[in-house]
């Protein structure tokens, strides 16, 4: 459920996390899920099939996107898109003026123009079966445009636990990689994107 606090904006759940007031009802769980799936799919994977035009940086026109969604969901209102984006705790989407895009997770070919990360080390969680292959060949994107790395050990472990019960965390020497010309783009506070990570910059962290 998405609600709106007059002081702190949109939030998910029954009360504002900052002031604990219930705020104004905006969107129920069912509609939030439907919109979320369509927004994620369109901005990351199938903009053309959804009927919107995406530029090389992943941006699409917000008003045009709302019109597409209104045709699909007759209950759709523009506010719902803002509510979905602004209440998203993972920061998956970005609105800038009249445009909207996904911050990460793309399978379509985009050139995300983020600033370079200044984190000296970033992290990648893998299954035990993957480790030797990664140390030999490096990390390449699978079904996505970019390799997704974490800015903290804890986040890398959290992500890896989705896919394996016994994650192994690889540390990436980001500072040295960038000195050697490898771009590491800061997508969110916790996510760094790269075209690939060669094996020379990878190290296994022991528990």
From Swiss-Prot:
Pfam families: PTS_2-RNA. The keyword NAD applies. Belongs to the KptA/TPT1 family. Removes the 2'-phosphate from RNA via an intermediate in which the phosphate is ADP-ribosylated by NAD followed by a presumed transesterification to release the RNA and generate ADP-ribose 1''-2''-cyclic phosphate (APPR>P). May function as an ADP-ribosylase. Its EC number is 2.7.1.-. The keyword Transferase applies. This is Probable RNA 2'-phosphotransferase. One of its GO terms (molecular function) is tRNA 2'-phosphotransferase activity. Keywords: NAD, Transferase. InterPro entries: Ptrans_KptA/Tpt1, RNA_2'-PTrans_C, RNA_2'-PTrans_KptA, RNA_2'-PTrans_N. One of its GO terms (biological process) is tRNA splicing, via endonucleolytic cleavage and ligation. It is an enzyme of class 2 (transferase).
């Amino acid at each position: 459920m998405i609600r709106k606090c007059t002081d702190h904006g949109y939030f998910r759940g029954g009360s504002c996390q900052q002031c604990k007031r219930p705020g104004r009802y905006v969107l129920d769980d069912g509609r939030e899920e439907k919109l979320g799936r369509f927004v994620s799919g369109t901005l990351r994977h199938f903009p053309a099939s959804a009927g919107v035009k995406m530029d090389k940086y992943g941006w699409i026109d917000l008003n045009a996107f709302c019109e597409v969604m209104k045709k699909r969901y007759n209950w759709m209102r523009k506010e719902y898109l803002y509510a979905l984006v602004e209440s998203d705790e993972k920061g998956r989407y970005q609105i800038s003026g009249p445009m909207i895009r996904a911050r990460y997770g793309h399978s379509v070919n985009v050139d995300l123009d983020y600033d370079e990360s200044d984190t000296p080390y970033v992290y990648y969680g893998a299954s035990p079966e993957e480790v030797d292959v990664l140390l030999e060949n490096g990390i390449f994107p699978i079904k996505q445009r970019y390799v997704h790395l974490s800015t903290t050990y804890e986040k890398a472990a959290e992500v890896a636990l989705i896919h394996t019960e016994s994650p192994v965390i690889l540390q990436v020497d980001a500072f040295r990689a960038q000195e050697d010309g490898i771009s590491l783009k800061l997508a969110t506070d916790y996510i760094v994107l790269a075209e690939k990570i060669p094996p020379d910059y990878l190290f296994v962290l022991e528990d």
